[in-house]
From Swiss-Prot:
It comes from Influenza A virus (strain A/Hickox/1940 H1N1). The gene is HA. Its main location: virion. SUPFAM superfamilies: Influenza hemagglutinin (stalk), Viral protein domain. The record marks 344-345 as: Cleavage. This is Hemagglutinin. It is a single-pass type I membrane protein. Belongs to the influenza viruses hemagglutinin family. Major glycoprotein, comprises over 80% of the envelope proteins present in virus particle. The extent of infection into host organism is determined by HA. Influenza viruses bud from the apical surface of polarized epithelial cells (e.g. bronchial epithelial cells) into lumen of lungs and are therefore usually pneumotropic. The reason is that HA is cleaved by tryptase clara which is restricted to lungs. However, HAs of H5 and H7 pantropic avian viruses subtypes can be cleaved by furin and subtilisin-type enzymes, allowing the virus to grow in other organs than lungs. Gene3D superfamilies: 3.90.20.10, 3.90.209.20, Hemagglutinin Chain A, Domain 2 (2.10.77.10). Palmitoylated. GO terms for biological process: clathrin-dependent endocytosis of virus by host cell; fusion of virus membrane with host endosome membrane; fusion of virus membrane with host plasma membrane; viral budding from plasma membrane; virion attachment to host cell. The lineage of its organism: Viruses, Riboviria, Orthornavirae, Negarnaviricota, Polyploviricotina. Glycans are attached at residues 27-28, 40, 104, 179, 286, 304, 498.
Length: 566
């Protein structure tokens, strides 16, 4: 009996067996990502794909300053409003910046025909040559070129007029018919502007042009219009009851434009040979100009980012990330951080048997922890880690490259009569924006799910690699660990890690130790059975003795009577 109890104590006493465990890296990162199946998964490493910051300034685009219109708008700049005279010297720009409520446009009241189309054309122009299409001093010898000024276009307290147009009036009591032509020899498109004056009454008409009925004709290969002045009383605007309507056309290289009139012509003085640039555009912004450079400009401010998406503004100029409505687009590159992997993912095997990551393993994503008589330590599996890093890096770069289509996205121009078209365009743009946002978010969710499952699969494969080497020379004890049936020094541990473990070398020792452990288990079973029988018999005897004592006491004091009948 003593021998059996000794065996039991030996079996119950703890022994420090050599062990090796498979695990994964963990750190103090608080980065969270979303996947198809989960929200806010804490991971060791991740990359942000969404730019949400800007500097709040207008900057040079690729080293080229923008054309900042200040208090002028496109009409005031291109017609030559006297208050916009400082802009006349500008010849090139990266983009055009206009304030939302610019004061100086058409100073003499009237309509600007196809103004939105002109803005659209100028949005793709990065430079122009301003030149005299009809030199002022020699083009109009039979007409007055000096008295055509107005208080509506005053400058520095004096009446003035547009710097790119001439208001032709009668000279010496007559307004002879005029016929002027220009041939475009610039090898570029030429923007030509002119106007037609509509007096408020017949007296003004006769005073200025010496005739009641007048016309203006403008003809080119692609343009053919005849204008008749509309003489009528109108409410005064900027002190003027008359009106001027403004017109423009683009003259192709080699084409000719002909002006014919017998009154009311606001003649071209300067025209513009246009040079287009793909990166140009017009933005409406209250941001101030600053000494800074950028590759991407928005109305809110400049973006300096190589990320594929941004949520700052849908209108951009330059090499800009794609606008989406998302608030978070973060792609995982590392592993799940502690706590452990628990649920099965969408695409691969799950290393759900490992309860937590190792903060002590800092030189890799997956690896080993061993313990033997020589000590303990962590070691990363460099091959599987490097393969994972290469695969994930290539995937992230591929996603960014595919989605990072840098481009300019400027607003389309619509006039007041095209409100329904503008609303329809907004709905279409919103639809595309929703699709882009959905695609971007779904892409990130799917890739995050795949990456996390990829890591889980790698840990599982590493575990199976060790298990297949050790076979029955060790036993699985849970949490990704194996307990050896033999002594495994550091050299032995290293062979397990690098895949050169010599199974036959340790199989005999393992077999003997395994049989001893199995024998101890059998002896322990016998001891447990003996103890159980002994305990049962002893308990029964104690119970019988107790009952007998109680019965004797009760009989002696008369509480219990016993009768024996024969």
């Amino acid at each position: 009996m003593k021998a059996k109890l000794l065996i039991l104590l030996c079996a119950l006493s703890a022994t420090d067996a050599d062990t090796i465990c498979i695990g994964y890296h963990a750190n103090n990162s608080t980065d969270t990502v979303d996947t198809v199946l989960e929200k806010n998964v804490t991971v060791t490493h991740s990359v942000n794909l969404l730019e949400d910051s800007h500097n709040g300034k207008l900057c040079r685009l690729k080293g080229i300053a923008p054309l900042q219109l200040g208090k002028c708008n496109i009409a005031g700049w291109i017609l030559g409003n006297p208050e916009c005279e400082s802009l006349l010297s500008k010849r090139s720009w990266s983009y055009i910046a206009e304030t939302p409520n610019s004061e100086n446009g058409t100073c003499y009241p009237g309509d600007f025909a196809d103004y939105e189309e002109l803005r659209e054309q100028l949005s793709s122009v990065s430079s122009f040559e301003r030149f005299e299409i009809f030199p002022k001093e020699r083009s109009w010898p039979n007409h007055n070129i000096n008295i055509g000024v107005t208080a509506a276009c005053s400058h520095a307290g004096k009446s003035s007029f547009y710097k790119n147009l001439l208001w032709l009036t009668e000279k010496d009591g007559s307004y002879p018919n005029l016929n002027k032509s220009y041939v475009n020899k610039k090898e570029k498109e030429v923007l030509v502007l002119w106007g037609v004056h509509h007096p408020s009454n017949i007296e003004n008409q006769k005073t200025l042009y010496r005739k009641e009925n007048a016309y203006v004709s403008v003809v080119s290969s692609n343009y053919n219009r005849r204008f008749t002045p509309e003489i009528a009383e109108r409410p005064k605007v900027r002190g003027q009851a008359g009106r001027m309507n403004y017109y423009w056309t683009l003259l192709e290289p080699g084409d000719t434009i002909i002006f014919e009139a017998n009154g009311n012509l606001i003649a071209p003085w300067y025209a513009f040979a246009l040079s287009r640039g793909l990166g140009s555009g017009i933005i409406t912004s209250n941001a101030s100009m600053d000494e800074c450079d950028t590759k991407c400009q928005t109305p809110q401010g400049a973006i300096n980012s190589s990320l594929p998406f941004q949520n700052i503004h849908p209108f951009t100029i330059g090499e800009c990330p794609k606008y989406v409505r998302s608030t978070k687009l973060r792609m995982v590159t590392g592993l799940r951080n502690i706590p452990s992997i628990q649920s099965r993912g969408l695409f691969g095997a799950i290393a759900g048997f490992i309860e937590g990551g190792w903060a002590g393993m800092i030189d890799g994503w997956y690896g080993y922890h061993h313990q033997n008589e020589q000590g303990s330590g962590y070691a990363a599996d460099q091959k599987s880690t490097q393969n994972a890093i290469n695969g994930i890096t290539n995937k992230v770069n591929s996603v960014i490259e595919k989605m990072n289509t840098q481009f300019t996205a400027v607003g389309k121009e619509f006039n007041k009569l095209e409100k329904r078209m503008e609303n329809l365009n907004k709905k279409v743009d919103d639809g595309f924006l929703d699709i882009w946002t959905y695609n971007a978010e779904l892409l990130v969710l799917l890739e995050n799910e795949r990456t996390l499952d990829f890591h889980d699969s790698n840990v599982k494969n590493l575990y199976e690699k060790v298990k297949n080497q050790l076979r029955n020379n060790a036993k699985e004890i849970g949490n990704g660990c194996f307990e050896f049936y033999h002594k495994c020094n550091n050299e032995c541990m290293e062979s397990v890690k690098n895949g050169t473990y010599d199974y036959p070398k340790y199989s005999e020792e393992s077999k003997l130790n395994r049989e001893k452990i199995d024998g101890v288990k059998l002896e322990s079973m016998g001891v447990y059975q003996i103890l159980a029988i002994y305990s049962t018999v002893a308990s029964s005897l104690v119970l019988l003795v107790s009952l007998g004592a109680i019965s004797f006491w009760m009989c002696s004091n008369g509480s219990l009577q016993c009768r024996i009948c024969i």
